[in-house]
Amino acid sequence: MLAVPLAVHVVVIDNSQPGLNLSFIQDERVTVVPTGANLGYGRGHNIALAASSRRCRYNLVLNTDLQMGPEVLPGLVEFMDAHPSAGMTMPKVLYPDGSLQRLCRLLPVPVDLIGRRFFARTRWAKARNRQYEFHDWNYDTVAEFPFLSGCFMLIRRSVLDTTGYFDERYFLYAEDLDLSRRINAVSRTLYVPSQCVVHEYRSQTRPSLRRLRYAAVSLTRYFSKWGWVHDPARYQANRKTLDQFDR
């Protein structure tokens, strides 16, 4: 991150117990914030966002298992500078073997996420997921989506000041969905495939009961907040997204 040809401020959240010895980091561009515990994905990133320099025009939220070349961040910053309506961008994301991660999505209805989590191998769940993740699209052109993955979110600071940070009621899962739709409501959330990163994500064929519990709690909170059935903003955002491909 420090090798990119930009002025950057890196905030590292150390949630280990006891804290790691990071005294070897002497670069003034790096701030280490020890929390002493895992506070959750959203809350941890909120601490980093609050600690970031107020002079930053953009904030980057990314997973620790993500790799990118030094050209990616400058390329996306250049794109957002040229497109002031863009509040957030995400690059093309690949698995380590070079295959595509389909991370451009619609705002889900409950059946979408229930199907993905518990009935993924059924025909109806596969059909819904095909539209939800745009399997019939080539992922090679700039397009707008209301839900972009939290593994890499480059966010315009002025937009983030308007929407607020992550909702800390989600410990794990759905925090990126919630923030992405709030940003999409006030600006454009764009997929920019001219830049590419590698995400070493590995899905669990049999997720632990603990993770299933986190998912159930977070999704219950999400749909209770935005609406289980009646969610006009969801319908409008999804219709706008699908209309891009009907022209």
Tell where the protein language model's regions lie, with residue ranges.
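Acidic metal-phosphate-binding loop of nucleotide-sugar-dependent transferases
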Residues: 39, 65-68, 170
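Active-site acidic Asp-centered loop
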Residues: 15, 35, 61-64, 167
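A short, conserved alpha-helix in the catalytic core of glycosyltransferases
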Residues: 137-140, 144-196
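Acidic donor-binding segment of Leloir-type glycosyltransferases
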Residues: 1-37, 47, 51-54
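Conserved donor NDP-sugar-binding/catalytic core segment of glycosyltransferases
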Residues: 67-103
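Short beta-strand-to-loop acidic/aromatic patch adjacent to the donor-nucleotide binding site
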Residues: 55-67
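Short, flexible, basic/aromatic active-site loop/helix in glycosyltransferases
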Residues: 108-145
